[in-house]
Amino acid sequence: MDKIKLGVLVGGTSIEREVSKKSCENLLANLDENKYDITVYHLPADGNTEWAKNIISNPPQIVLSALHGGNGENGSIQGFLHCLNIPYIGSKVLSSAICMNKAMAKTVMKANHIQVPDHVFVMRGVDFSQYEESIKLMVFPLIVKPNRGGSSIGVIVARNMEDIHYGIKNIMETYDDDVLIEKFIDGKEINCCVLQGENGPEAMAVLDVKKAGSVFVYDDKYHIDEYSSDITSLPDFMQDMIKSIAVKTFNV
């Protein structure tokens, strides 16, 4: 039986480049080389597109992306592969673009009656005074995060307006043009993966995620010694509710 020609994308220009490398290492360690003829495409930090010429001249049968953040998750890479008629694993162009933009994703979910935390969306170039009253109506502590970032990079817990100003300044100088300020929810961190199967979307097991503090931060996610998740001990009816919400969100 011929091996499947599998292309794996890694690197990229995103600030999450190092996370991408770790994901790629994990993928390669678990892919069966007896089943797949694997080509790794390294996307350089400087944006050089030589990798794209290689994938065009010798296209794989399918692509598995280990890219994190930026063009790797916002629909850009997905659109590129779509235009080349190269199948790829993961969300398609529109869903990738929406999900990478947290404010847009929350707007879409609210329109479909899926509960999301209260938030204020702060844009670069708009005077802060236009947001200040809305923020003051929220109850501290609040979460301040990049609107289009991942891996918890740039996320802080704000306990007063001084923290809010610091968080916005830090994010806009380093990570993103737009900032999301959200209600802080001190509760369980739950994961529920949804996969599209032959019979439609199916929710996987509900997992409890262990975290070192009250916020699920970068170190919790990517330092293996500190990260763990287990099948939840939540009652069955709560697990069913979580799975139902996960599938509904997937379908949206």
What kind of feature is each model-predicted range?
Residues R159-S244:
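Phosphate-binding site of ATP-dependent enzymes
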Residues E25-N26, K169, V247:
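Solvent-exposed alpha-helix faces
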Residues M1-L94, I98-M100, M104, M123-E132:
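ATP-binding N-terminal substructure of ATP-dependent carboxylate-amine bond-forming enzymes
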Residues N85-P87, I114, N199-G200:
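Glycine-enriched alpha-helix->loop->beta-strand junction motifs that scaffold or abut catalytic
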Residues D2-L9, I38, I55, I98-E182, ...:
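Active-site nucleotide/adenylate-binding loops and adjacent lid/helix of ATP-dependent enzymes
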Residues E33, I114, E173-D177, K211, ...:
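Generic secondary-structure signature for well-ordered alpha-helical cores
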Residues D2-I4, H113, P235-V252:
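ATP-dependent carboxylate activation and anion-phosphoryl transfer catalytic cores
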